[in-house]
Amino acid sequence: MATIEVKDREGAAKGSVELPDEIFAQKVNIPLIHQVVVAQQAAGRQGTHSTKTRGEVRGGGKKPYRQKGTGRARQGSVRAPQFTGGGTVHGPKPRDYAQRTPKKMKAAALRGALSNRAQHGRIHVVSEFVPEDVTTKRTQTALKTLRKITDSDKVLVVLSREDQHNRLALRNLPEVHILDANQVNTYDVLYADDIVFTEAGYQEFLAHAKGSKIAASQEDDQ
């Protein structure tokens, strides 16, 4: 079982935590991860797009000219698809893009994504970003702490659900995406260059992982 250092606000080691093998040392299944990420992105689509067919466009009930004798092609409505202002043929209609993904697949994909980040040294744990007694320039203080940990432009910060102090300090930083410990997902882990847990957030994540069977045994996946 691997361990990583817990850094303080100055970037110095103040302890260590273990990275459980059942979460951070698993096989990276790229096709599975791709399937889960695509499903997650699809679920975020609104699917409210809509176009009108010739039967739904207002007007066009009158035949524009007689059937025969004009030398022109016969037409029955000015709302036919070939006319400007006419209906759309096979256009998009409202639909649900959500794909059903089994929980075990989501869990295995997340384990693979976290394992990849751990193998490349992109998992970090910090005691805190801002002390509780700091009430001014919190964002500046939090950014200074973050830069002692990583220089990445895309950072996923995982906080304890109750940690409002650090959340308020970090939320306006454009390079930071904040998640609660129970919201960690495959897409956000892969999108970020580095993942930084607070110490409390890391312990909460491990508890949630075991409770939701993210740390399921290998036998369950086979």
UniProtKB/Swiss-Prot annotation:
Source organism, top-level taxon:
Bacteria
Alphabetical GO CC annotations of the entry are:
ribonucleoprotein complex; ribosome
Q: Which residues form a coiled coil?
A: none
Question: Which GO molecular function annotation, any one, does this entry have?
Answer: structural constituent of ribosome
Region span, Disordered: 42-100
Q: Known InterPro entries for this protein?
A: Ribosomal_uL4, Ribosomal_uL4-like, Ribosomal_uL4_dom_sf
GO biological process terms on file:
translation
Query: Which Cys-Cys disulphide bridges does the record give?
Result: none
Basic residues bias: start-end ranges: 60-71
Look up keyword Zinc and say if it applies.
no
Cite a single Pfam family from the UniProt record.
Answer: Ribosomal_L4
Task: Give the range the annotation lists for the signal sequence.
Answer: none
Query: Which keywords accompany this UniProt record?
Result: Ribonucleoprotein, Ribosomal protein, RNA-binding, rRNA-binding
Q: Its family?
A: Belongs to the universal ribosomal protein uL4 family.
Q: Which NCBIfam families match?
A: rplD_bact (TIGR03953)
Instruction: Report the protein's function.
Output: One of the primary rRNA binding proteins, this protein initially binds near the 5'-end of the 23S rRNA. It is important during the early stages of 50S assembly. It makes multiple contacts with different domains of the 23S rRNA in the assembled 50S subunit and ribosome. Forms part of the polypeptide exit tunnel.
The UniProt subunit note reads as follows: Part of the 50S ribosomal subunit.
Name of this chain's protein:
Large ribosomal subunit protein uL4
Name the source organism.
Thermobifida fusca (strain YX)
